[in-house]
Amino acid sequence: MVPGIFASGKVFIMAFLQIAFHSNVLGMASSLDAIVPQSQNGPLKVLWLLHGLSDDHTIWQRRTSIERYADGRNLAVFMPNGARSFYCDIPGGLRYATHMAEELPAIVRSMFNLSDRREDNFIAGLSMGGYGAFKLALRHPDRYAAAASFSGVLDIGSFYRMMERDKVADVLGDFGCRNPDGGPEDPRALLSKLVADGAEIPRLYQACGTEDFLYADNISFRDFARGLGADLTYEEGPGSHTWLFWDTYVQRAMNWMGL
């Protein structure tokens, strides 16, 4: 026996699956990467990992050791393809928010033995995906126990204006308005409404590198959320908008979630 590998007395073997399927919501073929235990103890907990603007669903598996981090946790990890959608239902276009929050959970639950309990479902992402994770969790607070954002685009108005300046037309079209501040795509507005309604809010974990170009926006969101009394854990450390930072903090977030 190799020392350390089987110290617990159990052998955990993870399967990596690349799933191609037809999305009725998007009206086209799409893809999803999944990491699941080959054997399990009851229904699996679920972690959704969302990618950033310049990547796709394969990036978490290629740039981190997420399969190793998920090992032994009785956890399924799903990495969907959100394209450059900002996880929005794009006006006159593809409905990625509905795809992510409604269609994909139903698809994977038909394939795997997954828990549908709120306390067993989690969502996280980086950059655009960090924005998407917070937005989807705050839009559907009854479905997720916690959400994590790594270097997230959390001041969506500021980011929109930057994209407008740089003439990134596809991103500007995602939100369907000239200024998404305070609207249904703004995590601040969603959080404010939940607090005002006295609703149960998912726990939030936020991490950003101190050299990240989104650092000031992340500090602004942190202070805003704390001002509302939201249950938000914030961490920062040396680093910029890179996988070296995200690979470290996805591990910290998974432990914080209790996975």
Which role does the model predict for each range below?
Residues V2-L259:
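Non-catalytic cap/lid and distal C-terminal segments of serine-dependent acyl enzymes
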